[in-house]
Amino acid sequence: MGNKINPNGFRLGITKGWNSRWYAGKKQYSQLLKEDEKIRKLVSQKLAAAGIARIEIERAGQQVNVIISAAKPGIVIGKGGESIKQLRGEIERLVSAGTVAVNVAEIPNPNISAPLVALRIAEQIERRFAFRRAMKQAAQRVMESGARGVKVILSGRLGGAEQARTEKVLEGRVPLHTLRADIDYGTARAETTYGSLGIKVLVFNGEVIGGKTETLARPPRKSDERRREDGERPSRRRPTARRRPGGE
């Protein structure tokens, strides 16, 4: 089941929270759900250059609070706050009732944000980058930024092939069944001349123990440190062949 289920939904209520936080009756539920989808679509299209990783919506009474997690919050706010005021007005036209408040949260390390990594790979593929190179470079950047592991999955007509297939790149460790594992999950779609390519990214940042994420990193061995300082590669000795009794 680890490969078949959404990692965010699998850990919902344990290490992950809800993107929409409100309560409604049977008559209003479908209407508010449609409004949330329209708000997310508007923000994602209008602020694509800001690197939007997550859009959270809270409703309490007549108040609607939209929290945007972005890699470049300056683009969301705009000069003198003009962009965010314009965005608030457009969201108010989508909401049936209530006042709208828009808050912006900055992502401290965009390189380990799975949605942003997936979007970056999609942009490179649409610019005709080699898909294997884009996947490997993205995985290396994630590991260099302090993640414990990353898995990149690309599916579709890769390289214009007649038959669709799936390519995977795995660096480090990415547990799928550990519920306390802090795994960030993101998807994106690359539109090419041969069709659409689906991109999935899973980033493992450590394990959540006592409400805090612990990296559980292994300390480097002394032999490894000496090899790094000397710049020598570890020698690989071949096992010596043992002669059997009675043999030549």
From Swiss-Prot:
Region (Disordered): 212-248
Keyword field contains Membrane: no
Keyword RNA-binding recorded: yes
Keywords: Ribonucleoprotein, Ribosomal protein, RNA-binding, rRNA-binding
SUPFAM superfamilies on file: Prokaryotic type KH domain (KH-domain type II), Ribosomal protein S3 C-terminal domain
GO molecular function: mRNA binding; rRNA binding; structural constituent of ribosome
Biased composition range(s): Basic and acidic residues: 221-234
Pfam families documented for this protein: KH_2, Ribosomal_S3_C
InterPro entries linked: KH_dom-like_a/b, KH_dom_type_2, KH_sf_prok-type, Ribosomal_S3_C_sf, Ribosomal_uS3_bac-typ, Ribosomal_uS3_C, Ribosomal_uS3_CS
Sequence similarity: Belongs to the universal ribosomal protein uS3 family.
Cited function: Binds the lower part of the 30S subunit head. Binds mRNA in the 70S ribosome, positioning it for translation.
Protein's name according to its UniProt entry: Small ribosomal subunit protein uS3
Source organism: Deinococcus geothermalis (strain DSM 11300 / CIP 105573 / AG-3a)
